[in-house]
Swiss-Prot record:
It is found in: Plastid, Chloroplast. Usually encoded in the trnK tRNA gene intron. Probably assists in splicing its own and other chloroplast group II introns. One of its GO terms (cellular component) is chloroplast. Belongs to the intron maturase 2 family. MatK subfamily. It comes from Equisetum arvense. The gene is matK. Pfam families: Intron_maturas2 (PF01348), MatK_N (PF01824). This is Maturase K.
């Protein structure tokens, strides 16, 4: 559920009505406006009478929500109400559906405010678009020394989740209610194996991952590592400035020469994450492999109340090794350039190394995807897609059009375009074979009539219109 300006404005208006809004989040669940927002169905501002029948779908309505809220307000024994309500499956499903969505919105809005304050405090510059990953790595990772590849575990115990919430939320009533629904949902979804995963269909439980578990992890990583880098630079700045004292004092100079650590004032750590896969890169300093793992494990154990297996960590030297992320295989190579100095008598040749960032991807992954969808075989040979033969020619060409555009925009940041040319070849001939199978003709005839007008590369250069000219005229 995406936070919008309208939801934030509503959150501020409701918070003003609550007496202890700085300490308690539980009273926010008793405001009917939250359930209007969570259903993505807004009532006209001139008519805020929620007693009228406003149907959400075929089964639920806001009238049922109001009755449930009134019952909760008038209860003297919440435990008895929960037991009686759970006996009625219809009331239980409605209570879970709306109350969990309200919990989701309260947590999401609360975290949004906390994240904005955190970004200002630790000078966090974040980019939330997946399409900016390639350009970010090209620009920032070229000067990185070491890479930490981390896989966040998909599962978390409910009590560990409550402990994470307790660090930011001090409202005991809100925490008890959250604990009840988390344990209840865990018991219901044991057979379905949908507990605390990144599955988009599981909207009621993924809020714990998307908004608290990952947020707390990123918060500790950014804040603590920022403090570590600042202390690291200040403590080792003496090695870079006082060069005369090192030369005069042999003992100290020998000590400083034995330490090969050289730190830069612009030292920083770059962080990239997609779902449960995150990459951390150090720039301006070297960090021992065991120190990386020990530091992250301590954060996980003492702050997140979790234990992560060491095999989920892998450290690599970016100068020698490459890493895989989001279908890309990022690596760096040093290109040797010859520089000749100009002089009157002699012209010696001086060699200098220029670091150049190299982006490459393996051909296996796109071909596996195309083979799974039926566009080619395992070896990459194009085949016809029989399920599309019942569609019209325009629909077939438009479908291939969309697939090619998705591949191009995803892998468009590659320096070497060989992978794009291979995907283009597979899609073009798969499209031709599909049309040939539909018209019961040969690929050569279809290619001359229709596919000869295809110009994928030239169409992509257009700035205003990205529609490809796959089809001209109709062929019966």
């Amino acid at each position: 559920m995406k936070i919008t300006d309208k939801k934030l404005l509503l959150f501020e208006n409701i918070s003003k009505k609550v007496t202890y809004q700085q300490r308690f989040l539980y009273p926010l669940l008793f405001h009917k406006e939250f359930y209007v927002v969570t259903s993505d169905s807004f009532i006209d501002k001139s008519n805020m009478n929620l007693s009228k029948e406003f149907v959400l779908n075929d089964r639920y309505s806001f009238l049922v929500i109001r009755r449930l809220i009134n019952r909760i307000r008038n209860l003297n024994n919440s435990k008895k109400f929960i037991q009686t309500s759970l006996s009625d499956k219809s009331i239980c499903s409605k209570l879970d559906f709306y109350l969990l969505k309200a919990l989701n919105m309260v947590l999401e809005t609360f975290l949004l405010i906390q994240s904005e304050q955190t970004k200002k405090r630790v000078n966090w510059k974040s980019y939330k678009s997946i399409f900016s990953t390639c350009s970010f790595v090209e620009e920032k990772f070229i000067f990185s020394n070491q890479i930490l590849d981390l896989k966040i575990p998909h599962f978390i115990h409910p009590e560990s989740f409550i402990r994470i919430l307790r660090q930011q939320i001090k409202d005991a009533s809100f925490l008890h209610l959250t604990r009840f629904f988390v344990h209840e949902y865990k018991e219901r979804s044991k057979n379905e194996k949908l507990i605390y995963s990144f599955n988009k269909r599981n909207k009621f439980v993924t809020f714990s991952w998307n908004f608290f578990y990952i947020f707390e992890l990123e918060f500790f990583l950014t804040s603590l590592l920022t403090r570590f880098i600042n202390n690291l630079v200040l403590s080792n700045l003496f090695d870079q400035i006082n060069l005369l004292e090192k030369i005069n004092n042999n003992n100290k100079s020998q000590f400083f020469l034995s330490e090969k650590r050289i730190y830069n004032q612009n030292s920083c750590i770059h962080y990239v994450r997609y779902q449960n896969h995150c990459i951390m890169a150090s720039e301006g300093f070297y960090f021992h492999d065991t120190n990386w793992i020990y530091y992250i494990l301590n954060i996980w154990q003492f702050f997140m109340h979790l234990w992560i297996q060491p095999f989920r960590f892998s450290t690599k030297h970016f100068q020698k090794q490459s890493f895989f992320f989001l279908g890309y295989q990022f690596g760096r190579e040093s290109k040797l350039l010859k520089v000749r100095s100009i002089s009157l008598d002699k012209s010696p040749t001086i060699y200098s190394r220029l670091k150049k960032n190299l982006l490459k991807t393996q051909i296996v992954y796109p071909i596996d995807f195309l083979a799974k969808e039926g566009f080619c075989d395992i070896s990459g040979y194009p085949i016809s897609r029989s399920t599309w033969t019942t569609s019209t020619d325009e629909e077939i060409l438009l479908n291939f059009n969309k697939i090619w555009k998705s591949f191009y925009f995803y892998y468009g940041g590659l320096i070497k375009k060989d992978i794009l040319y291979r995907i283009k070849y597979i899609l073009r001939f798969s499209c031709a074979k599909t049309l040939a199978r539909k018209h019961k003709s040969t690929t050569r005839v279809v290619w001359k009539k229709i596919v000869s007008d295809l110009s994928l590369s030239s169409s992509l250069r257009r700035k205003k219109n990205f529609h490809f000219v796959f089809f001209q005229g109709s062929h019966g």
